[in-house]
């Protein structure tokens, strides 16, 4: 028993160290200006250390893999306490419909084009599509946990989604300020929340909008986050069909149901602000360590021939979000 505990603790300690470095980097003005969260920085630090970790014989691999799976799911569940059903009423049926169409359309289109047009493998296509459609890296991690995707594919998808999310975050304020898009402030908020990848991207891009528009942006984004639950439930049956013969077990994403349960609990019962803050910190800490673990076990030898195609898929979906999302907002909002 002692022999198994030591590598387990070493692995967790290594991921914790990566997480601490990521939190430290996130406070540096340069990274603050880019709105890069510790979650994103953690996977970058992990990927930078991946060659060394491979040469070291992957010390503490048991603990690292535990962080990449169990701690990941815990972080996703705790993330649900940041969303309340009451807040969703602020954008009405139109906001919900726009979010639903974006999630369904982008995920379906990305999964299809990645395989049929670009020749990407199915897993990478779905990860990029999910991250673009729902909530960036958090959605990719949720799908990775369900589909048991290799770490290097997850790292590729996260990198692509982060890139185009950052581009949008810097582009949108410039476009709004220049008046290139004929939208009302409220429509700008809905458009921002419906089309940007990460929650942090939405907050950054809407910072200069009126308060009402900022709230609309966050609410629409949170609707997309909630839609992750039914998406994962549907995918659990789709993924089953592509598994090897002899496996009849349905991959029910229990963590997705717990995520929904967290949303309901946070909506129906009073949570003091200190407790909500604690749960939010717990979610961020868990996901940051999980991202570090995924970066650490990334196999760069498997990245060849995939990067350009993955970027192409991300670019296509980015364009559809920009122009298709604008059309939806003009038509429905």
Curated annotation (Swiss-Prot):
Coiled-coil blocks: none
Keywords: Cell membrane, Membrane, Transmembrane, Transmembrane helix
Membrane topology: Multi-pass membrane protein
Residues that span the membrane, as ranges: 4-26, 31-53, 59-81, 88-110, 125-147, 154-176, 218-240, 253-275, 310-332
Gene Ontology CC annotations of this record: plasma membrane
InterPro entries named in the record: UPF0324_pro
Pfam families named among the record's database cross-references: Cons_hypoth698
Record has Repressor as a keyword: no
Compartments it resides in: Cell membrane
Cell inner membrane is among the record's keywords: no
Family listed: Belongs to the UPF0324 family.
This protein's name: UPF0324 membrane protein WS2204
């Amino acid at each position: 028993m002692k022999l198994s505990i030591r590598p387990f603790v070493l692995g967790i300690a290594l991921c914790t160290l990566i997480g601490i470095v990521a939190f430290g980097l996130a406070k540096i003005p340069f990274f603050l200006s880019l709105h890069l969260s510790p979650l994103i920085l953690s996977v970058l630090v992990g990927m930078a250390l991946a060659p060394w970790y491979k040469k070291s014989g992957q010390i503490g691999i048991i603990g690292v893999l535990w962080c990449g799976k169990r701690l990941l799911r815990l972080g996703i569940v705790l993330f649900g306490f940041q969303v309340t059903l009451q807040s969703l009423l602020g954008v009405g049926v139109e906001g919900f419909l726009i979010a639903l169409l974006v999630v369904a359309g982008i995920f379906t289109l990305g999964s299809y084009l990645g395989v049929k047009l670009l020749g990407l493998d199915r897993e990478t296509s779905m990860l990029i599509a999910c991250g673009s459609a729902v909530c960036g890296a958090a959605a990719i991690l949720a799908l990775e946990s369900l589909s048991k995707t290799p770490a290097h594919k997850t790292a590729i998808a996260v990198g692509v989604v982060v890139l185009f999310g950052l581009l949008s975050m810097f582009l949108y304020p410039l476009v709004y300020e220049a008046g290139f898009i004929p939208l009302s402030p409220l429509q700008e908020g809905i458009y921002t929340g419906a089309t940007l990848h990460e929650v942090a991207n939405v907050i950054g891009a809407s910072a200069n909008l009126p308060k009402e528009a900022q709230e609309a942006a966050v609410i629409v984004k949170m609707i997309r986050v909630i839609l992750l639950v039914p998406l994962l439930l549907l995918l659990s049956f789709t993924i089953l069909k592509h598994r090897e013969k002899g496996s009849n077990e349905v991959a029910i994403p229990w963590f997705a149901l717990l995520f929904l349960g967290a949303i309901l609990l946070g909506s129906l019962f009073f949570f003091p602000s200190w407790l909500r803050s604690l749960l939010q910190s717990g979610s961020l800490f868990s996901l940051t360590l999980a991202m570090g673990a995924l970066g650490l076990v990334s196999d760069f030898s498997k990245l060849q021939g995939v990067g350009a195609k993955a970027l192409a898929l991300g670019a296509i979906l980015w364009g559809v979000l920009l122009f298709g999302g604008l059309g939806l907002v003009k038509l429905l909002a």
